[in-house]
Amino acid sequence: MLEILWANITPIQTFVSSNHLTMLYGLKRFGCRLYHHSKSTRYIDATAKVVSQEPAAISSTGAIPLNSPAAPLLSQDVLIVERQLEMMNVFLGYEQANRYVILNQQGQHLGYIAEQGASSILSSLSRQFFHTHRAFKADVMDSNGQLVLQLNRPFSWINSRLQIHSIDYSKFSSTLVGEVLQKWHLWRRRYELFLAKRSMFEQFAKIDERVLSWEFLLRNEQDRILGSVSRNFMGLPREFFTDTGNYVLRFTSTSAANGSVNENQLLQAAHGIANDVCARDMSLEERAVMLGSAVTIDFDYFSRIHGGPALGLNIPFMFGGSSSNHDYPAEDLSAQEILKNDQETTPSTNDSSSETKSPFLSDADLDQQDFWDIFDRDGDD
């Protein structure tokens, strides 16, 4: 049962982009108490406030303006994207719709990513037969359930492609922000990242890593590091038997090359050479495309292909091995480690006000409904 505290839901609105017609759920203010259920993360109270973040000072193409609802989410220095445990996938080999939780570096809840068509028969069949080749759309929402971005990945046999769209509620439309294009290679993991500018795409970064890499560095045309997407190792049982995983996204800023090598992960990736780090603020559009790259990397290299019920004995599509020999400092722990200590309270601020509130629920609330059940009622596109 979902305990509704307050809700003000706008009617379903239709947004038209140049490429497709998309039905978007106009959750302008969703004041329900929303719970995410996971054995590793316990329960997250989505009504807990998060740290207020000023929008990044750059909007390079105008696709994501500074007043966009996506700006606070994308203005974080570090994002942790955690894929959630799928129990039917573990025990029956049944491919479920992917769901992610987005956290900041302090473990505070920022939003969700939910694949559309969780209960649709056609989408379910597509997941079982085409697996990682399937087409899908996913909604990126803030902690209030408001839609801020959409991810659209068309069907592909070899090179995957994922497009990112921003949402403009004032014009009832969506705008193409950019795309992530996989480049096939026999022994390397390669991607090209583009921004949409008018009727053309402009590449701003590339990824070119070893075949077993778990760290994906974004490099610009001068081969300088622009950011990184790192998959954290979660333990052999979870890596082998489940599709869970979390990814740490680090965005560059004007101070990206500052500090010591032991404390700066981007500087570690550059082997201590500060000039190899591109010390500039990434635009909101670049950050959105980088967020999409984490999702498509998860699909391409860290999802599993199932041949039917296997009681969890599913062979990974491709194993990974860390490409970095550095031990990251304590503040860069995985989402599970950040969320383990449910006795701590998390300070949060909203504009000029501040309060201390734990993002976790007590054991008395464990019988409440899962947040994701809201999306199990959506239909196929």
UniProtKB/Swiss-Prot annotation:
InterPro entries from the UniProt entry: Scramblase, Tubby-like_C
Chief subcellular location: mitochondrion
Compositionally biased tracts (Polar residues): 344-359
Cellular compartments annotated: Mitochondrion
Any GO MF annotation of the entry: phospholipid scramblase activity
Keyword Hydrolase: no
Database matches in Pfam families: Scramblase
Keywords: Mitochondrion
Gene Ontology BP term (one): plasma membrane phospholipid scrambling
Gene Ontology CC entries for this record: mitochondrion; plasma membrane
Region (Disordered) residue spans: 336-369
Keyword Cell membrane listed: no
Similarity remark: Belongs to the phospholipid scramblase family.
This protein's name: Phospholipid scramblase family protein C343.06c
UniProt source species: Schizosaccharomyces pombe (strain 972 / ATCC 24843)
